[in-house]
């Protein structure tokens, strides 16, 4: 949120969100670094950024009591918590007679802008994508290049140290994104040993790059890459129209799936100790870097849900803690896709065999050897499950 009394710049870090994270969470470090950059830029114009830390509703109430606020501007957020938070902020502002303006920002199309002819939301990706492209080609997409900072409020707020906010440095750094990787994305995207992905996820997630700028740059470069950006918006509109997916299956008929939920097996999956190299390499990469190649994400998710028969919500929550590019909509949508419980999901009989996947996408074990140093040592664990025995009971099969 930015609170503006004419040209006064303020930012509120939401305690309800950050208190659930480790103090050295790399994403908090990333946000802090970019807020500091904003503050330094403002100081060039004799202004500064005031940083608050707390419950946003309480902070806004306190601000309105202390200073005169003309209006508040913020961007739309489509997660249920954020929607309720912003409604609470709006109510507080109304008590003080302060207008509350919200805007679309993190997507090209939102909410009801890409729907069926009858106004209902799409629940299958391909027709959504086709309508999205049709609308995009009919819409003038512009990048705001306004750089007029002459009317900023003069201020010199001290920028807080990370420690003052209760955080500490992280050993994990968010990498810079590289759009040069987009050119051959369709040819290289499934090979995890290649450094062939743009790493743009965290930057889209935290708004350090404009989705409009990115789409305009890649739309004529690689259609496969553009499709991935459209998938992101597809899952966002699913979350908007069907908020129950946060904690429930998209399709209620799968609520009777009999998850085994073996805690010891889940722990081994988290630690990359399943005895299946492709799965373990992915989990070890995630734990060390906050990143996992998309092909490997599908393999690890399928293994957890369809070989170990552990509830997708367990895996979704673990990824939420670790992924630098974590977005609720995409994370939830992809996990439900892998489990077969979501919209446009992989059916129960589609199982990513991690051993067969090696033959297709890491035949020389280049990726695996990078992340599993003890692959051929006695210390490497034995497989925790027989791949020939997929844990789908007959009642569970019937539920599908």
Residue ranges and their predicted role:
Residues 196-369:
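Active-site-proximal binding-pocket segments
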Residues 77, 234, 397:
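Flexible loop residues that form catalytic
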Residues 120-254, 357-389, 393:
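Glycine/tryptophan-enriched, flexible segments
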Residues 5-9, 13-136, 221, 284:
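Trp/Phe/Arg-rich N-terminal binding region typifying the photolyase-homology
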Residues 1-8, 12, 390-391, 396-400:
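Single conserved hydrophobic/aromatic residue that forms the stacking wall/gate
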Residues 35-40, 88-89, 109-114, 186-191, ...:
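Intrinsically disordered, low-complexity boundary segments flanking structured domains
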């Amino acid at each position: 949120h930015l609170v503006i009394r004419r040209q006064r710049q303020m930012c509120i870090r939401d305690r309800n969100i950050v208190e659930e994270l480790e103090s050295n969470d790399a994403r908090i470090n990333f946000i802090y670094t970019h807020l500091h950059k904003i503050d330094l830029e403002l100081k060039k114009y004799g202004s500064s950024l005031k940083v608050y830390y707390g419950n946003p509703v309480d902070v806004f109430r306190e601000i309105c009591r202390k200073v005169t606020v003309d209006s508040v501007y913020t961007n739309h957020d489509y997660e249920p918590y954020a929607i309720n938070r912003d409604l609470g902020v709006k109510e507080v502002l109304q008590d003080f007679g302060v207008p509350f303006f919200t805007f679309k920002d993190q997507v090209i199309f939102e909410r009801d802008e890409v729907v069926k002819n009858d106004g209902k939301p799409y629940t299958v990706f391909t027709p959504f994508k086709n309508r999205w492209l049709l609308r995009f080609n009919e819409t003038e997409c512009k990048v705001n290049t306004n750089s007029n900072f002459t009317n900023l409020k003069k201020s010199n707020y001290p920028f807080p140290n990370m420690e003052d906010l209760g955080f500490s440095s992280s050993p994990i750094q968010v990498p810079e994104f590289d759009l040069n990787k987009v050119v051959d994305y369709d040819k290289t995207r499934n090979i995890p040993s290649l450094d062939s992905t743009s790493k743009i996820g965290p930057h889209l997630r935290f708004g350090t790059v404009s989705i409009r700028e990115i789409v305009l740059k890649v739309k004529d470069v690689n259609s496969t890459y553009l499709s991935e950006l459209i998938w992101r918006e597809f899952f966002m509109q699913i979350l908007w129209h069907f908020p129950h997916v946060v904690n429930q299956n998209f399709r209620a008929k799968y609520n009777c799936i009999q998850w085994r939920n073996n805690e010891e097996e889940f722990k081994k999956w988290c630690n990359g100790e399943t005895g299946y190299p492709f799965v373990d390499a992915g989990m070890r990469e995630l734990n060390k870097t906050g990143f996992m190649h998309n092909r490997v994400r599908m393999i690890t998710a399928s293994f957890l849900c369809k070989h170990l028969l552990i509830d997708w919500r367990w895996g979704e929550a673990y990824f939420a803690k670790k992924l630098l590019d974590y977005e609720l909509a995409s994370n939830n949508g992809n996990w439900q896709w892998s489990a077969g419980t979501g919209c446009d999901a992989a059916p129960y009989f589609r199982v990513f065999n991690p051993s067969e996947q090696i033959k297709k996408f890491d035949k020389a074990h280049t990726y695996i050897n990078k992340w599993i140093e003890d692959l051929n040592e006695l210390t490497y664990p034995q497989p925790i499950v027989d791949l020939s025995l997929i844990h789908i009971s007959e009642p569970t099969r019937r539920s599908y």
